[in-house]
């Protein structure tokens, strides 16, 4: 895995060059919102967790408004295992019965979210955690999963939702008060139920509603890969349709790429899928010229 060098070991002139390279990007994104889908190894390895917290604080300090939407699949799996329950997935979505939903709410809205918030605040930032149920943020509806074996039929995957609507007022209020919002992807339905929503889908929809300048999705691979394992650095809507059709994009990448493409088509100017295993990957993507990950284009 590639890593950034320790800044303490870099010559002063090179440090200056790095800062100078970042300047035009700081100007470009100053005052703008950047939505970051945070997940994968970056959420579990201590070095990466600390690096991410510092990176988010730096973005805020230079006038960029980061909004974090986090996942937590591995943590949910561990919690389910403790109660003797195994996670099941259909087309990249977690089957969520009532018992699983209780675990999801506790893990995402409690353990995982508070870990992120605490770390950011520990390093001097000002983060506030909330779920989609707070402030009426995410209105959800039950997801109807098409049955691929029976056209026209649907598979019941429980309390799995999709975004019906987003009310960004609470997020904007936090941004106005210089806080960093950290959002757990749990929505509420008109039926009074809580819904587990894929974090990629929430991040994409939120980026559109907030008129974000950029959407960054962190994952455990370099980006979107072809069948030979080569990184695809730039993908158009037509190319993505082809990758869906031939099965190159499958499993957990399905909702990620679908959400990224929808965001690009809906006006988010820059959409990237990046390797969260690389330290400071968010800063590399936002504040440098270095080509990184996969760019998703709407045309």
From Swiss-Prot:
<dbReference type="InterPro" id="IPR004662">
    <property type="entry name" value="AcgluKinase_fam"/>
</dbReference>
<keyword id="KW-0547">Nucleotide-binding</keyword>
<keyword id="KW-0067">ATP-binding</keyword>
<comment type="similarity">
    <text>Belongs to the acetylglutamate kinase family. ArgB subfamily.</text>
</comment>
<feature type="binding site">
    <location>
        <position position="196"/>
    </location>
    <ligand>
        <name>substrate</name>
    </ligand>
</feature>
<keyword id="KW-0808">Transferase</keyword>
<dbReference type="GO" id="GO:0003991">
    <property type="term" value="F:acetylglutamate kinase activity"/>
</dbReference>
<feature type="site" description="Transition state stabilizer">
    <location>
        <position position="256"/>
    </location>
</feature>
<dbReference type="GO" id="GO:0006526">
    <property type="term" value="P:L-arginine biosynthetic process"/>
</dbReference>
<feature type="binding site">
    <location>
        <begin position="72"/>
        <end position="73"/>
    </location>
    <ligand>
        <name>substrate</name>
    </ligand>
</feature>
<dbReference type="InterPro" id="IPR001048">
    <property type="entry name" value="Asp/Glu/Uridylate_kinase"/>
</dbReference>
<feature type="site" description="Transition state stabilizer">
    <location>
        <position position="37"/>
    </location>
</feature>
<protein>
    <recommendedName>
        <fullName>Acetylglutamate kinase</fullName>
        <ecNumber>2.7.2.8</ecNumber>
    </recommendedName>
</protein>
<feature type="binding site">
    <location>
        <position position="94"/>
    </location>
    <ligand>
        <name>substrate</name>
    </ligand>
</feature>
<dbReference type="InterPro" id="IPR041727">
    <property type="entry name" value="NAGK-C"/>
</dbReference>
<keyword id="KW-0055">Arginine biosynthesis</keyword>
<comment type="pathway">
    <text>Amino-acid biosynthesis; L-arginine biosynthesis; N(2)-acetyl-L-ornithine from L-glutamate: step 2/4.</text>
</comment>
<dbReference type="Pfam" id="PF00696">
    <property type="entry name" value="AA_kinase"/>
</dbReference>
<dbReference type="GO" id="GO:0005524">
    <property type="term" value="F:ATP binding"/>
</dbReference>
<comment type="function">
    <text>Catalyzes the ATP-dependent phosphorylation of N-acetyl-L-glutamate.</text>
</comment>
<keyword id="KW-0028">Amino-acid biosynthesis</keyword>
<keyword id="KW-0963">Cytoplasm</keyword>
<dbReference type="GO" id="GO:0005737">
    <property type="term" value="C:cytoplasm"/>
</dbReference>
<keyword id="KW-0418">Kinase</keyword>
<dbReference type="GO" id="GO:0042450">
    <property type="term" value="P:arginine biosynthetic process via ornithine"/>
</dbReference>
<dbReference type="InterPro" id="IPR037528">
    <property type="entry name" value="ArgB"/>
</dbReference>
<dbReference type="InterPro" id="IPR036393">
    <property type="entry name" value="AceGlu_kinase-like_sf"/>
</dbReference>
């Amino acid at each position: 895995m590639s890593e950034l060098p320790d800044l303490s070991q870099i010559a002063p002139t090179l440090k200056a060059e790095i800062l100078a390279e970042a300047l035009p990007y700081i100007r470009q994104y100053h005052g703008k919102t950047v939505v970051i889908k945070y997940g994968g190894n970056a959420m579990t390895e201590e070095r990466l967790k600390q690096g991410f917290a510092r990176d988010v604080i730096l973005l805020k300090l230079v006038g960029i408004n980061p909004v974090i939407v986090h996942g937590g699949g591995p943590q949910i799996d561990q919690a389910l295992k403790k109660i003797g329950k195994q996670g099941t997935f259909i087309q990249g979505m977690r089957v969520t019965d009532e018992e699983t939903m209780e675990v999801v709410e506790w893990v995402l809205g409690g353990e995982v979210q508070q870990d992120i918030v605490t770390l950011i605040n520990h390093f001097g930032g000002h983060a506030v955690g909330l779920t989609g149920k707070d402030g009426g943020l995410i209105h959800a509806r039950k997801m109807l999963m098409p049955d691929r074996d029976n056209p026209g039929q649907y598979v019941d995957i429980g309390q799995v939702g999709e975004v019906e609507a987003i009310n960004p007022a609470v997020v904007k209020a936090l941004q106005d008060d210089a806080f960093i919002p950290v959002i757990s992807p749990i929505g509420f339905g008109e039926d009074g139920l809580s819904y587990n929503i894929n974090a990629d889908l929430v991040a994409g929809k939120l980026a559109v509603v907030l008129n974000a300048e950029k959407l960054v999705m962190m994952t455990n691979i370099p980006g979107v890969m072809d069948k030979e394992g080569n990184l695809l650095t730039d993908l158009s809507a037509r190319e993505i349709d082809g990758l869906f059709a031939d099965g190159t994009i499958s499993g957990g990448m399905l909702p990620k790429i679908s959400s990224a493409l929808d965001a690009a088509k809906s006006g988010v100017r820059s959409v990237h899928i990046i390797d969260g295993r690389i330290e400071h990957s968010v800063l590399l993507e936002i504040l440098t010229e270095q080509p990184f990950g996969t760019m998703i284009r709407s045309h």
